[in-house]
């Protein structure tokens, strides 16, 4: 049981920033999240972005949720697509995750980066898992949009590394050594 569970004051709690937005950013910076790359076919080829907001919602039918910043150059392609692909990344895909987090995302003519699913959709074979989805709903909230999507197909990749997580503005690998017993 932690100190908080026992009604005691936590021993290592830093004072919260005085500004709510700064405190919010600090709280979520300290909260690790799995890393995904979300792609869709755009008018100029596949477009994509890195997201740490992907979460499972339901099993039958399989539904997931994520949010994206509408300021992202790839957001319009994803929001306008009838299907998109969510790539759950592992540590072997950290360079791809970094590239999709910036403006230098891989182009379609880069060898070995892209492949096509039997449906014709582009995907990243370096991902741990590939989930082909169709949007069920979108909800704009300020400069973000929350997307709820049904998973249509799944391709499980070969194990090429430990899960990739984002924590304190950096990518980390979640290894077997990090398991708590």
Name these PLM-found stretches.
Residues 2-181:
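Basic, polyanion-binding surface patches
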């Amino acid at each position: 049981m932690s100190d908080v569970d026992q009604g005691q004051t936590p021993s290592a709690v830093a004072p919260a920033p005085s500004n709510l937005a700064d405190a919010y950013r600090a709280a979520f910076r300290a909260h690790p999240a799995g890393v995904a790359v979300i792609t869709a076919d755009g008018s100029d080829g596949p477009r994509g972005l890195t997201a740490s907001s992907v979460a499972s919602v339901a099993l039958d039918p399989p539904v997931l949720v994520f949010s994206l910043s509408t300021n992202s150059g790839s957001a319009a392609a994803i929001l306008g697509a009838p299907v998109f692909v969510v790539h759950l990344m592992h540590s072997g895909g950290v360079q791809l995750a970094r590239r999709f987090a910036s403006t230098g995302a891989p182009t379609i003519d880069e060898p070995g980066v892209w492949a096509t699913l039997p449906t014709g959709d582009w995907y990243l074979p370096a991902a741990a898992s590939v989930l082909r989805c169709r949007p069920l709903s979108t909800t704009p909230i300020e400069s973000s949009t929350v997307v709820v999507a049904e998973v249509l197909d799944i391709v499980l990749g070969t194990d090429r590394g430990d899960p990739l997580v984002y924590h304190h503005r950096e990518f980390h690998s979640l290894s077997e050594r990090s398991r708590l017993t």
